Every structure is written in C-alpha cells, then in structure tokens.
Amino acid sequence: MVTAGMTPRDAVRQLEARLTAAGCPDADYDAAELFRLVTGRDVRLADAPLTEVQAARLESLCLRREAREPLQYLCGHWSFLDFELIVGPGVLCPRADTEVVAETAAQTLAGVKAPRVLDLCAGTGCLGLGVKRFCPAAQVTC
C-alpha cells in the first residue's frame, strides 16, 4: 500500500510490484507515469516524501490500473505524434503503432494534389488528425 511519508522511489517500486503482480505488461512505465501524474515530477528528480493527498491519489489510481483500466484513461489525455488527445472510457486509446499508420498514410498521400481522408470508427480521430498534421492540404473528416 502506498502511504504518506514514503520516498518517491519506494512508492514507485511499490506501485511497480503491484502492477507486475496484476499482470500489467509495462508496470515500470505505468508506475512512473502514475507518480508523474500525481506529483507533476519525474521520480528521478523527486526527493520529497509523499503527502497524504498524494499517497491517497496514487493508491486510488493503482487500484484502478490493477483492475486493468487503461493508463490513458487514468491520465485523461495521451500523446499522439506531436499533440495531446483527450481520452476516456468509450474511446479507443491512441497507441504508438497507430502513429506509424498515420505516417504511412501521409507518405502515401504525399503526391496527391488534394487528398481526401475519412477516419471513421477508429477511436479518437487521431489517424485523421495525424494525416492532417503531415498533409495540411488534405481534406480530413473524422
């Protein structure tokens, strides 16, 4: 259990152990991200012990992640290419491999004079937004 007074490193180690036991595939990353979300600091740069409020929030978020709620939902936003997307339940989470799809689509459209892109039923609309970022002349509908 994460408690007030824990050092940042001990708290993150505790989170990582619990998330690993729960079968979360990237427990080390998730633990560090949850810590950053709650404290606003990278664990490598933090030295102040956890406050009661921080410990309670970390504990709550860890329980939700242990129940396999996506990290993206816990954060409420997620990076995709060079922008942030708001995410939550009911929205497919943008993933790094989806960035490759957006980049490949943009490369494919590079020679097209007035490309038209339709992004339907793929989650946040991140594919269409990503193509638009690379091909500003594209007419994109999400």
Q: Where do the language-model regions lie?
A:
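A short N-terminal interaction module
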Residues: 2-54, 58
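Conserved SAM/SAH cofactor-binding pocket of Class I
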Residues: 99-142
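Short coil/turn residues that cap or connect secondary-structure elements
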Residues: 19, 23-26, 66, 113, ...
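Conserved AdoMet
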Residues: 35-107
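A general structural signal for well-ordered alpha-helical segments in protein cores
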Residues: 12, 31, 58, 68-71, ...
